[in-house]
Design a protein with these regions (language model features):
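Short, glycine/serine-rich, charged loops/turns that create anion-binding
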Residues: 4-5, 38, 64, 128
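Generic N-terminal amphipathic, Lys/Arg-enriched alpha-helix
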Residues: 1-11, 23-30
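Short, hydrophobic alpha-helical segments
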Residues: 160-171
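Short, amphipathic alpha-helical "lid/cap" segments that border enzyme active or binding sites
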Residues: 18-21, 153-158
Length: 172
């Protein structure tokens, strides 16, 4: 989960997203990402990292049709829904854990959906956006799930895999 290109993120944060994708693939994880139709994003950078490491990628896109920005995704699922909650719900509920990097309103929506669905969230801090604001915080006073903070792509992936394993034990 991460910023779309219109938020003008830095090359540094793009490299971090790429690294997260690469590390997920190296751990034999499947990368689900928000497949954009009209621009690059941190999610597509993660897709490129996963693909370069030989991983499996699943792009969830809005609307109809499979024409997306990142042409190398293995599986593209057009959910028939639009941005702003519908596509994000399909994307997040397909995951055993989510990793947020930077992020604007779309990332915040995805984190709120994960929180409500009891899906573990890891926030890679140090790159701004909602990930920085929510690292090691709860989304509200109910304190359902702590957003797990991480300081590096390696730590984020390690923590996400550990949290995902616990999630699968609880909900298998």
């Amino acid at each position: 989960m991460g910023s779309a290109a219109d938020l003008k993120y830095s090359k540094e944060v793009e490299r971090a997203a790429y690294e997260v994708g690469r590390l997920i693939a190296e751990e034999d994880g499947i990368l689900f990402f928000g497949a954009e139709k009209d621009s690059d994003s941190l999610s597509t950078a993660a897709c490129r990292g996963a693909k370069d490491a030989g991983g499996l990628t699943v792009g969830i896109t809005y609307g109809k049709g499979k024409d997306i920005w990142e042409k190398d995704a293995d599986i593209i699922i057009p959910c028939g829904l639009e941005r702003g909650g519908g596509r994000e719900t399909v994307l997040v509920t397909g995951c055993d854990a989510v990793i947020a990097i930077s992020g604007g309103s779309g990332t915040l929506t995805e984190l709120a959906i994960a929180y409500q669905a009891d899906i573990p969230m890891v926030a890679l801090a140090g790159y701004g956006g909602w990930a920085d604001k929510l690292a090691d915080e709860y989304l509200d006073t109910r304190n359902r799930i702590l957003t797990i903070g991480a300081a590096s792509p390696e730590e984020a992936v390690k923590k996400a895999f550990a949290a995902a394993a616990e999630y699968r034990r609880r909900y298998a």
